[in-house]
Amino acid sequence: MFAKLSYYAHSAQDKLGNLLPYEYWQTLQNHSVNVGEMAAEFARVFGAQEVACQTGKLHDLGKYSEAFNHRLHGGSSVDHATAGAKIAVERWGNVIGKLMAFCIAGHHAGLANGNGEGDNRRTLKQRLALKFGEDIPTLDNLWQQEIKLPETLSAPPLKADAHHPFFSYAFFTRMLYSCLVDADYLDTEAFYSNLENKAVERGGYPDLNALQHNFNQFINDFRRRIAQAPEQTEAEKRNAVLNRLRSEILDNAVEQAAQAQGLFTLTVPTGGGKTFTSMAFALEHAKRHGMRRVIYVIPFTSIIEQNAAEFRKVFGELGEQAVLEHHSTFDDGKLQNEATKDKLRLASENWDAPIVVTTAVQFFESLFADRSSRCRKLHNIAGSVIILDEAQMLPLNLLLPIMQAIKELAQNYRCSIVMCTATQPAVQAENGFYRGFENVREIAPKPTALFDKLRRTTVQHIGTQTYADLLAKLGEHPQMLVIVNNRRHARSLYDQAKHLDGTFHLTTLMCAKHRSQKLDEIRGRLKNGEPCRVIATSLIEAGVDVDFPLVMRAEAGLDSVAQAAGRCNREGKRPSENSFVWIFAPEDKWKVPPELATQAAVMRLAADSFSDDLLSTQAVAAYFAELYQLKGSELDNKKILKMHNDTGQSLDFPFQTIADKFRMIESHMQPLIIPFDADAENLINSLRYADHIGGLLRKLQPYTVQIPRKSPRCFV
């Protein structure tokens, strides 16, 4: 009954944990061929199908050994990944073979450093030095009969970047790794699901054409409604003009969608409808060029839910199953269909949904990651339209490697990238940015004229403001927003102003649930014309939908000033000349923090040069050009590109070190769960008894705050 017929990749057990007969096991040949074929299909979009196929075939080669057979029967663990890595280098050499070896050796442990030191992980050089029969098990020659390998292997059609050619090879390795690990996961999942007679809810999404049909229907219905809206009052007339302008912007963008794939900008002022315009362009561009999905990348977790909800709405009955919302705070409890919940939960692992809405942290850290769980999705980024919302928010200290990744996606992976913002960063070569983006196409109609038509505020720098000055203005203006640069300043100012009617305080030391309740109260008071004085940190600039007649902003970068201006006269109901954004210099005690000092200094220069229109496209371009010039090497202060260049000749890329260094948010903070209400208390109590806490922790995200790891114990 238990006669051994072959070597096996996976054993099978009954419900009691007893081994089933071999006929239920997955043979190693079956698994290796399946993974090779699936990896090849994943890599086809970027022309690397043959390399991916052979990588898949070799990934578990070390299982062709008695040692691993013993492991399947309860023995000790065995290194089954190094064997395939060694064979790849022996067969295909130190270029393509070595890139394959990184993937094969790391398909469980993660991509290692090529040489030097590794953090609890052997380097590839150390792995390749291991000897068959001594350090790793001897292979049964049966593998050569079951796994057919070509003598030669053509390199994929990789157009290496002229200035950073080795970056292209490292990027390709991560893409190849993605194809391998996703194929390995999926074939293993399919085997065990079949064994247990379980259906796996993957795939079966609506296609982009169906989504575009629903999207266009929604837009056309909206246009019909606004065409019939009254235009009697001044506010109604302004709203009608605004909606006509939004339609013109959207139509113009869609007309540009036939252009060749590559890099685009959408430079539209706040209120110009860039969210729907960018999606309209992306859907048409994808249709014209046979692209596979749209990935919408947002810098703020706080607004990702609102954007994802808007997309579900415009896609109608297809929205819930088409839109994958992938970020740390996503709670699938708001989805109605249980099958859809399961499918999207699985889709978050590899991003195979047609519409992905995610954070910039998730997107870019994955592109530089070393772990299989983070890299698994990468191959599904290829062939996508990628919308970078609020592109100016990309972190300055990682800007150069991020730009290099964007270039790589456009050049070698059939992607188009739309940089979408009201304050377009001057990262093009034509703006003087050294080795910046080239051939970038603007899809908005005449951005300079748009900014004139959509001007809603008057921005002024009013000099230094003492506490007394700020308190006087808060007392004088019943509805106003004051934004400062740190939580201590916000709290201190609030303590002195809280005697005023309708005074609120918002910082990240309040959990999201608490902030959400306060914002609802704030919006209600603003709508009803009641006193509403808000003192907040920059968190309120992150797409929060509030509309004040007056905003004061402590000195910061011009992009932050523009975000603050988006909270003033947001609905365009007041004339711009009566809607003020006042920039001020705080007292020395609350001066600009060091990390914002350069941005604030350059903003002051722009305020001097463009005092008549500080948020004009010319002012923004001048601001970013000067800022990037001053920052220089700090635009890659983790030396990510240097690490690629220094190790490129030998292809000994330090993948593990790069992944560790590429952090868009430094992890000097720790989450603290706040028992804010009965729901939070119930969830916290459930944690004590839960076997799997991942789902509970996601539900608790709205009740967490981030505090420094070195905070006093009184916090906890």
How does the language model describe each region?
Residues 422-475:
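Interdomain hinge/linker at the junction between the two RecA-like core domains of SF2 helicases
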